[in-house]
UniProtKB/Swiss-Prot annotation:
Record-level GO BP terms: cobalamin biosynthetic process
GO MF entries: ABC-type vitamin B12 transporter activity; threonine-phosphate decarboxylase activity
Source organism (scientific name): Desulfotalea psychrophila (strain LSv54 / DSM 12343)
Domain of life assignment: Bacteria
GO annotation, cellular component aspect: plasma membrane
Record's bilayer topology term: Multi-pass membrane protein
Keywords (A to Z) from UniProt: Cell membrane, Cobalamin biosynthesis, Membrane, Transmembrane, Transmembrane helix
Pathway given in the UniProt record: Cofactor biosynthesis; adenosylcobalamin biosynthesis
Gene that encodes the chain: cobD
Protein name: Cobalamin biosynthesis protein CobD
Length: 330
């Protein structure tokens, strides 16, 4: 039954995505991060410790809010709690939105839209400066963000959902409830990294705790994602041997300790080269190339990357659930 609920959350995201009218929990987390930052910055002299307190306060607030929420739901029939937990879990994965935003760039490219418009579409999903990117660089940046977001926007929340659910019998909590708490706590960590984890003067110290915690939370999911991409490459007609080769060779050729793993596997699977120098906030960041340019990169690589995302999501979800069943028998 637990497996069905997890798969239901994935299917809900595939069909619904994140409707703009929906009061998305991650937006609430973002507001909390801003509030705690404004609270601690003027009160704590050292920026690093102000950042640590912000991280602890946000996580505590998220967990306590969920605890109160599910405690209140206990007065209703159990199916209400299950439904609420599935809905919360569904909001933590981003399959449809990742596809929607990246495929908007793809369509602009194949329809011959002017580059300024295409760059604006790309800017919605990447952190780098897009104003001067040419056509190949736009494609490359889109494929990179698809690979990275597969790991931290889809696989990681599912990983932590299933991982925490294993402890449900020990804590006397329903597995799907603990799964939603695990996924939402991860999203809080990931959102803090997105908002605070910059290496500029304002956040280099304040955001360090958020960035390090996010690195830890994504360590295993990123590697699972890369291995999932390699497996799908063999199973779905992509270049499996090259995916494995580039994963082993280039996975640490990245400024992030985790993002290089799925990006390397994806570059190998598609026979393309990713990364290289990029511009962030007006500054050139020298990044090594990942992969071999066995052919020229093309817009269809964006579509193929999204296809790999879908296959990898279902493969790893099933493997996570199988591992849970082996451990718990549930």
């Amino acid at each position: 039954m637990f497996s069905i609920k997890i798969l239901l959350a994935i299917i809900l995201d595939l069909f619904l995505g994140d409707p703009s009218c929906y009061p998305h929990p991650v937006r609430c987390i973002g507001l909390a991060i801003n509030r705690w930052e404004k609270f601690y910055r003027p009160r704590v002299a050292q920026p690093f410790w102000a950042g640590v307190l912000t991280v602890c306060s946000v996580l505590t607030l998220v967990i306590l809010t969920l605890a109160v929420f599910f405690t209140l739901l206990a007065i209703f029939p159990p199916i209400v709690t299950d439904f609420a937990a599935v809905l919360l879990l569904y909001t933590t994965v981003a399959i449809k939105d990742l596809k929607k935003e990246s495929m908007a760039v793809y369509r602009a490219l194949i329809q011959g839209e002017d580059l300024p418009k295409t760059r604006k579409l790309l800017a919605r999903i990447v952190g780098r400066d897009t104003e001067n990117l040419d056509r190949p660089a736009i494609i490359r940046a889109t494929v990179e963000t698809v690979g990275e977001n597969l790991a931290d926007g889809i696989i990681a929340p599912l990983f932590w959902a299933v991982a925490l659910s294993i402890f449900a019998p020990l804590l006397g909590v329903k597995a799907i409830v603990l799964a939603s708490v695990g996924a939402m706590s991860y999203k809080a960590i990931n959102t803090m990294d997105s908002m605070l984890g910059y290496k500029n003067e304002r956040y280099i110290l304040f955001g360090r705790a958020a960035a390090r915690l996010d690195d830890w939370a994504n360590w295993l999911p990123a590697r699972c994602t890369a291995l999932g991409i390699v497996a799908i490459s063999f199973m779905a007609g992509y270049n499996g041997p090259q995916a494995w080769k580039i994963f082993k060779r280039d996975r640490y050729q990245h400024t992030s300790p985790n993002a290089g793993h799925p990006e390397a596997a994806l570059a190998g699977a598609l026979n393309i080269r990713l990364c290289g120098p990029s511009v962030y906030f007006g500054n050139i960041v020298e990044k090594p190339y990942i992969g071999n340019a066995l052919r020229a990169i093309e817009p269809d690589d964006i579509r193929q990357a999204n296809r790999i995302v879908l296959f990898t999501t279902f493969l790893l979800s099933l493997l996570f659930l199988l591992f849970r069943f082996v451990l718990t028998g549930l």
